[in-house]
Amino acid sequence: MKCFKNTTVYVDGEGLKKCTVVFDEKIEEISACDCVKADEIALPEDAIVLPGFVDQHIHGAGGSDGMDGTVEDIAIIAKTIAAEGTTSFLVTTMTQSPENITKAMTAVKEYRTANSQDGARVVGVHLEGPFIAAAHKGAQPLEYVKEPDIAAFDGYNQASGNAIRIVTLAPEVAGAEDFIRHLTEIGVVTSIGHTGAKCADIEKAIAVGASNVTHTYNAQSALHHREIGTVGSAMLFDALNCEIIADTIHVSVPAMRLMVKNKPVDKLTLITDAMRAKGIPDGVSELGGQVVYVKNGEARLEDGTLAGSVLRMNRAVQNMVEKVGVPFTQAVDYATINPAKTLKIDNEVGSIKVGKRADFTVLNKNYDVVLTVRDGKVIYQA
């Protein structure tokens, strides 16, 4: 048994409080008393113990990408993102050939079957593409974009060991409505993204089960006073949980403030949407077979299109607090309990509560990650 003794902890339902947390693989006790029989993990005086971060949209890190399609590359991503406090994540794909997507799915199945205890936990897959709108492909390769195909999806899902948790698609394209119904029936989250959808398209999508918006503001129809598009609909409909890349590059600070003011506190989720260059020096990188130039925290294709981020989740939380003006615990919720609810794993992770998994990220006053713990095991220490 281990413990964090007499330190500041973000406790589920109680906010920030000085207490002692006793844990093994799961959280055993949260107490005001520090006279517990457990091995203390010493922390700095300014430490704050938070739930482990949950990243539902990340392509890669540490020089590896989920589309590389190997167990080894997934392991590198998992270990790299532990250093930013992430304890659970979805391996996120992109629009590619069926062969490459299937290869990536197979690697996820193999990795999860092996049940690695190193690095962040792979909860499943976020299938971003190929079922998107060509006109809003962003950094997704055009030649592999296709209309929603239930049989193709089922093949990918089977290859993954039924691990697909989210599918990004454009609801306005032919076949989308039946596809969303299928996803809803099997418990997979439909995320509206890479889309030119109008408000009416999104209303129809919500009616058959769509519940998430992929990297809100980016690669989607903008808000206009005569047609509010995807961005306006994301803010209008409380049924939609909105992902946001809070690096201040993909989305400006005022745009983030607008989103915060127009979404319920439990309907906004921080993502990194990071690509393989996260955690390694600037230079030339790759995304989906395309050359990416990484400089000063920005990843772009040759034509200037943003190609994912190199954002760390602890810095996303910091940006929301210090630049957007969100209360600290609310910003933490955006990176923990909100995505956990979307992925239907909030009974296990996403908050610090007796009986939940012992997943923690420990930050100092500068938002640096001091320690990351998953299932009671230290997976990163500064």
PLM segments and residue spans:
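Histidine-rich, glycine-flanked metal-binding segment
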Residues: 1-5, 9-50
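Divalent metal-dependent hydrolysis catalytic cores, especially in the metallo-beta-lactamase
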Residues: 59, 75-104, 120-133, 160-172, ...
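Active-site gating loops and adjacent loop-to-helix segments of metal-dependent hydrolytic enzymes
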Residues: 79-90, 134-161, 204-216, 227-241, ...
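His/Asp/Glu-enriched, well-ordered alpha-helical/loop segment
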Residues: 232-242, 248, 260-272, 278-363
